[in-house]
Amino acid sequence: MKLSRRSFMKANAVAAAAAAAGLSVPGVARAVVGQQEAIKWDKAPCRFCGTGCGVLVGTQQGRVVACQGDPDAPVNRGLNCIKGYFLPKIMYGKDRLTQPLLRMKNGKYDKEGEFTPITWDQAFDVMEEKFKTALKEKGPESIGMFGSGQWTIWEGYAASKLFKAGFRSNNIDPNARHCMASAVVGFMRTFGMDEPMGCYDDIEQADAFVLWGANMAEMHPILWSRITNRRLSNQNVTVAVLSTYQHRSFELADNGIIFTPQSDLVILNYIANYIIQNNAINQDFFSKHVNLRKGATDIGYGLRPTHPLEKAAKNPGSDASEPMSFEDYKAFVAEYTLEKTAEMTGVPKDQLEQLAQLYADPNKKVISYWTMGFNQHTRGVWANNLVYNLHLLTGKISQPGCGPFSLTGQPSACGTAREVGTFAHRLPADMVVTNEKHRDICEKKWNIPSGTIPAKIGLHAVAQDRALKDGKLNVYWTMCTNNMQAGPNINEERMPGWRDPRNFIIVSDPYPTVSALAADLILPTAMWVEKEGAYGNAERRTQFWRQQVQAPGEAKSDLWQLVQFSRRFKTEEVWPEDLLAKKPELRGKTLYEVLYATPEVSKFPVSELAEDQLNDESRELGFYLQKGLFEEYAWFGRGHGHDLAPFDDYHKARGLRWPVVNGKETQWRYSEGNDPYVKAGEGYKFYGKPDGKAVIFALPFEPAAEAPDEEYDLWLSTGRVLEHWHTGSMTRRVPELHRAFPEAVLFIHPLDAKARDLRRGDKVKVVSRRGEVISIVETRGRNRPPQGLVYMPFFDAAQLVNKLTLDATDPLSKETDFKKCAVKLEKV
């Protein structure tokens, strides 16, 4: 190959960057460097985590052949993590699904049959029959959908409309229930609005970083690179890391803290006590912008009502609270002394004091980061509320360089699951189904009869499993998620319902995942840049991308599937007569006509697309579907502090952080001069609350739902590793990533292994009260648990660690605690 000087320099740059990242350059990328003229490049956000890195996607001859960090992307500034560099390969696994597959025997659907290729029409025929039968015989509560924080914004919006408005069922929930629900409820309780007030620009201005249950070095490596740069370039910057086991983020920590599982609640209250005792309250901020409330306690563990722990709870599921005085709050946290905290947590006193001093020092700008260690917690909402307390006591919030920041794990857990409102209780822009006014706003905008959207909260993720097992939920469609592997308590609460002959399970996915193979019908699905999309990341940044290639075979996007399936239903088949009587003009129309092909949605012509621009859905339907859905959805938040920019602006920009008012994005919410909703002279205004004040909650320590005992003598914590993402359904199909971490292992303290006659590399049976798996002993490596705790990642389909986990949830958020259950080990 003959290279120009420019191409030669680019080739060297690629090789150098790859070497610095510890990578070999994929052969296809090597070839690409010298063939720039043949490659078409376009922008997109990364397909993986909630950081929202920008990438440049290289396509050639209808395939994605290369990917590089986008130097113009403000999030990552041209840098990718190891997963981002291999994005092209996630799309071309050898087992990519290209046609619908139905379990059949003797030419007909059979629950025990073999997967057999069928057409899309045949697939929709079977689905139509199953949905209509369930709706007719048992009503809207017998059908459900499990969606995703990986849906595009308009896919989530279309799904929510179809179920909540079309089928009149709120039984739709996203997999973000398993990762971000506690953050959502925490934000709503404290501030009255969801999502962080700060942004990534805080990193370069902060004096201290505190990680609560967040291994950012592996789970948010690009943000970690920015924190590392800040720490190493300024000797006065401090990093504290709190976890139940030692991981890679500890390598940068000035104060690395290992605490007993569940006792983070104790540490949080101790710091609040320290702030008060040392007169470190920002009195001006506190007196003007904060209310105090005492929350209900002994609220249970989100288990089945028949479980002994639920029967014993005095206030199961209670979100109640009552006003309290400062003196009462001071007395409440005073119980969390240094001595008591050290005893309950196992953390040395000097480390606790160092941590508390960071928050108490008025000259230190502090950012608190957290992810699943806080959220996947039976008191996850409380943990979120308690960390907000520290920032509200000190006034370290809504200003550059300081604030509490909940990091998301999925690319659009914020933009789709939360902002669109695909949770069983939510509607767009923080509205909820239980509020009559909110339902009325949606019904009027959607031009459907008053009373169409049910007021009853639908089934959340874990409740869906239980309802399937109990035969109450009979038709279940999952999209863009692998919950059979990712959800808790597989043996007792999920697999029985999926394989129950009363139930029909549909899985839409690009690959034959554990979930797909447990289903009755598999729908082949387009992924990432095989469709036009939009994600919303952790810092409220909404990012768009164009369709850049076509999906293989007959694979179709989730949006196409939802919209085309809606054609199978007429209003009189899904709505009662009293609703139809309110809008007789809708009688005889299909849900496609009522929900999607409306004047509001269909008013943008396909001619707005460039002549050579791919957009399979819009060109098939004859109007710009994505733009119509987005503009209708964006209407709900404009003028209400959730303002999104016009559709076309996002295709021009590298994302914009809402609220976007008069073309300007917002970096810091709730503070004067930064937020357009805070007027001059107000200073701060937490306008999600009627009085503009945030809430400090008094909430105590309460124990975990399950803890080690004489028989099951170890804590088990589960999570991720750098090389793989969630269940590995994409990353394990990338040879380089698979080789880097080919199978899950059980990380264990060497002394715990020795006490059980186990050595590194031994096979071991990990047993809980719910199931067992075989894994490999690892006494070294990146994760170093303390004695009494073992850690196991969940990416490996051959080691389904969620056979072990308990389906205990936070009673307020309904989010599962994947970090704490009890296990024992048996040598194999």
Curated annotation (Swiss-Prot):
Mutation: A17L; reported impact is: Impairs interaction with NapD
Q: Which GO terms describe its biological process?
A: anaerobic respiration; Mo-molybdopterin cofactor biosynthetic process; nitrate assimilation
Q: Chief location of this protein? A: periplasm
Query: What regulates the activity here?
Result: Interaction in the cytoplasm with the NapD chaperone prevents premature export.
Q: May I have one GO cellular component term?
A: nitrate reductase complex
Where is [4Fe-4S] cluster annotated to bind? C46, C49, C53, C81
Q: What cofactor is this protein dependent on?
A: [4Fe-4S] cluster; Mo-bis(molybdopterin guanine dinucleotide)
Q: Could you tell me the superkingdom of the organism this chain comes from? A: Bacteria
Q: Where does Mo-bis(molybdopterin guanine dinucleotide) bind?
A: 83, 150, 175, 179, 212-219, 243-247, 262-264, 372, 376, 482, 508-509, 531, 558, 718-727, 802, 819
Q: How is it modified after translation?
A: Exported by the Tat system. The position of the signal peptide cleavage has been experimentally proven.
- Tell me which EC number(s) this protein carries: 1.9.6.1
Q: Which UniProt keywords apply?
A: 4Fe-4S, Electron transport, Iron, Iron-sulfur, Metal-binding, Molybdenum, Nitrate assimilation, Oxidoreductase, Periplasm, Signal, Transport
GO MF terms on file?
4 iron, 4 sulfur cluster binding; electron transfer activity; iron ion binding; molybdenum ion binding; molybdopterin cofactor binding; nitrate reductase (cytochrome) activity; nitrate reductase activity
Function (record text):
Catalytic subunit of the periplasmic nitrate reductase complex NapAB. Receives electrons from NapB and catalyzes the reduction of nitrate to nitrite.
Task: Describe the subunit structure.
Answer: Component of the periplasmic nitrate reductase NapAB complex composed of NapA and NapB. Before export to the periplasm, the NapA twin-arginine signal sequence interacts with NapD and NapF.
User: PANTHER family annotated for this entry?
Assistant: PERIPLASMIC NITRATE REDUCTASE, RESPIRATORY NITRATE REDUCTASE
Q: What is this protein called?
A: Periplasmic nitrate reductase
**Species, as recorded:** Escherichia coli (strain K12)
Record lineage: Bacteria, Pseudomonadati, Pseudomonadota, Gammaproteobacteria, Enterobacterales
| Gene that produces this protein | napA
